[in-house]
Structures are given as structure tokens and as C-alpha cells.
């Protein structure tokens, strides 16, 4: 059964709701709201790989986000990266 991945901006919204200590890491989350798919280009600049770079940047800077929701969402984001 093939399922369609959730839009990245939807995942970002769930992160915003769950990560209580987001604070200084917000800069790594904000770009995720621009994208639906991992293959999306930057909406303003049009460069390819923008969504992938944003997801990689977020994952690299989200080690302090813990818990079951964090684990599931990080797995989901890694799954998006592996699809491409």
C-alpha cells in the first residue's frame, strides 16, 4: 500500500505545536513552511534542492527536541529524504 507523504509544511506545523523549547531553533523550522514536497524548489529564488536542504538543516539542529512525537516526525522527515 503506497501512501502519499504529508506536505512538509504540515509536518512543520506539528513540530511547532509539540516542541515547547523551540526558541533559538525556530530559524531551522521556519523554512519548512515554504514546501510541500522534498523535491520543491525555493519559491522566491527557484533553486533546486531547497526543500531537501531545509529538512537536512532542521534535522541537524533538532537534537534537543525529544519525545515520541519528535521521534516519529524525525523518522518521517528522514523517510522523505530517502524517497528522493
Residue ranges and their predicted role:
Residues 12, 29-32, 52-55, 70, ...:
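Generic L/I/V-rich hydrophobic alpha-helical segments across diverse proteins
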Residues 38-64:
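Acidic, low-complexity, intrinsically disordered interaction modules
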Residues 61-83:
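Short, compact, well-ordered microdomains
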Amino acid at each position: 500500500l503506497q501512501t502519499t507523504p504529508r506536505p512538509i509544511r504540515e509536518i512543520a506545523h506539528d513540530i511547532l505545536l509539540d516542541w515547547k523549547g523551540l526558541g533559538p531553533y525556530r530559524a531551522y523550522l521556519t523554512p519548512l513552511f515554504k514546501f510541500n514536497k522534498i523535491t520543491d524548489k525555493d519559491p522566491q529564488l527557484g533553486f533546486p534542492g531547497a526543500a531537501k536542504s531545509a529538512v537536512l538543516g532542521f534535522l541537524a539542529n533538532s537534537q534537543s527536541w525529544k519525545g515520541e512525537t519528535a521521534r516519529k516526525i524525525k523518522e518521517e522527515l528522514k523517510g522523505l529524504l530517502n524517497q528522493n
